[in-house]
Amino acid sequence: MADKTLNQIRTTFLDYFEKNDHKIVESSNLVPNNDPTLMFANSGMVQFKNIFTGLEKRDYVRATTSQKCVRAGGKHNDLENVGYTPRHHTFFEMLGNFSFGDYFKEEAISYAWNLITKEFGIDKNRLYVTVYHNDEEAFNFWKKIAGFSDDRIIKIATSDNFWSMGDTGPCGPCSEIFYDHGDHLEGGLPGTKNEDGNRFIEIWNLVFMQYEQISKDKRINLPKPSVDTGMGLERIAALLQGTHDNYETDHFKKLILSASDTLNVKVTDDNQSSFRVIADHLRASSFLLAEGVLPSNEGRGYVLRRIMRRGMRHSHLLGSKKPVFYNIFKTLLEEMSNNYPELERAQSLIKETLKTEEEKFLVLLDRGIKILNEELEKVEKILPGEVAFKLYDTFGFPLDLTEDILKNKSMTVDGEKFDLLMKESKKLAKKNWKGSGDSSVDQIWFDIKDRLGATDFLGYSTDKAEGVVTLILKNNKEVQDLQENDEGIIITNQTPFYGESGGQVADTGIISKEAFEFEVSDVQKKLGDLFVHYGKVKRGSVKLKDNVELKIDTQRRNNIRAYHSATHLLHEALRRVLGEHVTQKGSLVQSDRLRFDFSHMKPISDEEIRKIEHYVNSIIEKKSEVKTRIMTPKEAVENGALALFGEKYGDEVRVLSMGDEEGKFFSTELCGGTHVVNTADIGKFKIISQSSIAAGVRRVEALRDAQLIDFLKEKENQSNLSDQKNEAVIKELETKIIKLGGKPNLQNKDQVTLIKDLNRQFDQLSVISILKDKDKNKINDQTINGFKVRFQNIIDLPFKDLRKLIDEGKKEIGEGLVVIYAINDNKVGLAVGVTKTLEKKFDAVKIVRAGSEVIGGKGGGGRADFAQAGGTLPDKIEESFENIKKLIN
């Protein structure tokens, strides 16, 4: 196998188990869809968790996978070791085979032994295994199958050889297979003091789930024991290619060579750690971006940003002064897109995000390192936590990046002080990612679902139906009935009410019978298909097993379904106009509007908006029939259906297609929502606003038909007052232009003065027009430390007009401060104004400098009452304003 590539080794593993009646199951998403408490998939068993716990069943009992995994952040965090050891990665692939109540220890050991010694051809004399100290079954099976003597089967009594899902749930002993890389490397056998060396390396872990942990002191046998195994692809590839170092495999060599060529720097012993960091972090960053995770300051996005910035800092160490990551991506695409086509589908988004993020970070990096070096001259061994926090808070240096810089200087950081400052900071609200586990409330729904089964949803074909009350809840407790004015929950055996999901809001309506009426205010789908009606009894009473009529608000439903269909058309139009990198990041489909969030790095131009609207309206005007088909997920994707990352699909999916375009559908998506029968039912469509909600994420809002007419009338009424005020000015300008009588005489002082006056007045009208546009002009008046502060964020405003708006703002607030940010052409202008009465207390120059350093600016200038600066980081506006607020306080 020494001549096999990493890709070929992956194929050999999967093919071997497929020949042995295992179903090859595609890797699940890195962002788990069955465990919201887990940050990233970190092992092969994550996607099978609910099968092992009995909450889910599939049509196979044997499976094999190559699972994408990320270990960075949370409980499993390998980030700080990457680049400095032969085996640590942030992104890796976990090969595995699984038995769900089918075969057990003997077969699992036999499959493993045959694969590694026969298919892979590994010398059995270099192999050792461990078993849990009291697992005599596994001990004896290894002797029988492998012919091992007792000294090659090592009994381990620690938790390293006993696996559990949590404090309760499935658990069992492990058996690990180790390979001896030779006595030229340091390290001892597992269980010895020097077991952590590079000589004896674990290559495969076999987990035998045979118990269920009921409580701390109680454990019972599972009726159907299962098997979960994990083998790191990069680790086995290193072994089979004759090295103990994962970074010396064919795959990493290509990535490192690509980085070397791009940077025009040769790999040496002194700089190889940096090249390894770049190769590893490019993989993790690209796969996370492909799934729609974008760099941000919280949650998964923050972990991605940490990975990206650590890698980019190492390219900077190698002499790079411009973005390089996006250029190296092409090699990763060549290497992995055949097995992971999502890389190709998202390549535009990946490259653009890598480039933009590196451009931003390089600006911050130079300034941050300068400050860090100045502070390092003042200390000997430990960097104060306050400095590390400033680097994090102002320059976007994650703590582990600062630690990585200090590592080469044999220094550390005061982590305790840093953590304390993080807790005190109100800016970044980090989510507390705990271990796996379900809340007690969730457990209620599991129990109810077990008793009642799924609810039959009839809402695709009808807006009313009869049903039987199967369960009533009041204050989260089961009761026999509900009386007048009681608030509670009703579950029926079937329902036409749509439960909130997929961005579509729930139906509302009435559940009734003679002398009883329950007003439904919300409907939620629990565990996928248990429909739960929330509401209040308006009259009468209801009890278990009553026959009732369920009727939705039809007019509201019709509006919702029209907006949902419009959302599908909008999604496809965005992809066609802006590019296939556009992926849905969120949506809200209501009865009076739609909101759609998607990945895109810059504002949409007016021309692009016109094209998008034209696409949508042209399909609506064609009066195309909307077609619904039921398929397997694989068939749906083969038919061009657009599936959404993070969505969980069953064995059959609902495929919605609409819009006839030269014999093909304009839009095809997997969707469980309600939709129009014909696109004509949508009515006229228009985008009314766009905004940025996060770095790389845009939001558009749109209206249709009656709501659009109402909106336009309201906007017209709002503008009439301003138009009346401006009308006199416009007429005066027209009169003055006529007086010029054609081409002006620039030698005539009166005409030159008139031209300047015209320009001034036109500029004034331009400013007034922007102020009227609520979509471009966001104003937030606050009181800080007893003073009025106006925070204003404006899109498309020429920076030269900032002074005018500051003056207008100061007039409006009377006494206080005005802080205005203007975004134009992906750059940001900042202006600060201080009213006359406060000039002795506040200095506009100091305030503008506090804000400009965060948005990538270089100081700023002006006077005590007005100062202005520019920057290159518009996504940092909120943080910049927070910095200003601190100074004011």
UniProtKB/Swiss-Prot annotation:
Family: Belongs to the class-II aminoacyl-tRNA synthetase family.
Recorded superkingdom: Bacteria
This enzyme's EC code(s): 6.1.1.7
Record protein name field: Alanine--tRNA ligase
Top EC class of this enzyme: ligase
UniProt xrefs under PROSITE patterns: AA_TRNA_LIGASE_II_ALA
Compartments it resides in: Cytoplasm
Cofactor: Zn(2+)
Pfam hit, one: DHHA1
Binding site for Zn(2+): H564, H568, C671, H675
An example molecular function term from Gene Ontology annotations: tRNA binding
InterPro entries reported in the protein's UniProt record: aa-tRNA-synth_II/BPL/LPL, Ala-tRNA-lgiase_IIc, Ala-tRNA-ligase_IIc_anticod-bd, Ala-tRNA-synth_IIc_core, Ala-tRNA-synth_IIc_N, Ala-tRNA_ligase, Ala_tRNA_ligase_euk/bac, DHHA1_dom
GO terms for cellular component: cytosol
Manner of cofactor binding, per the entry note: Binds 1 zinc ion per subunit.
Keyword terms: Aminoacyl-tRNA synthetase, ATP-binding, Cytoplasm, Ligase, Metal-binding, Nucleotide-binding, Protein biosynthesis, RNA-binding, tRNA-binding, Zinc
Catalytic activity: tRNA(Ala) + L-alanine + ATP = L-alanyl-tRNA(Ala) + AMP + diphosphate
Biological processes, Gene Ontology terms: alanyl-tRNA aminoacylation; negative regulation of DNA-templated transcription
Organism taxonomic ancestry: Bacteria, Pseudomonadati, Pseudomonadota, Alphaproteobacteria, Candidatus Pelagibacterales
Function: Catalyzes the attachment of alanine to tRNA(Ala) in a two-step reaction: alanine is first activated by ATP to form Ala-AMP and then transferred to the acceptor end of tRNA(Ala). Also edits incorrectly charged Ser-tRNA(Ala) and Gly-tRNA(Ala) via its editing domain.
Domains as described in the record: Consists of three domains; the N-terminal catalytic domain, the editing domain and the C-terminal C-Ala domain. The editing domain removes incorrectly charged amino acids, while the C-Ala domain, along with tRNA(Ala), serves as a bridge to cooperatively bring together the editing and aminoacylation centers thus stimulating deacylation of misacylated tRNAs.
Bridged cysteine pairs (disulfide): none
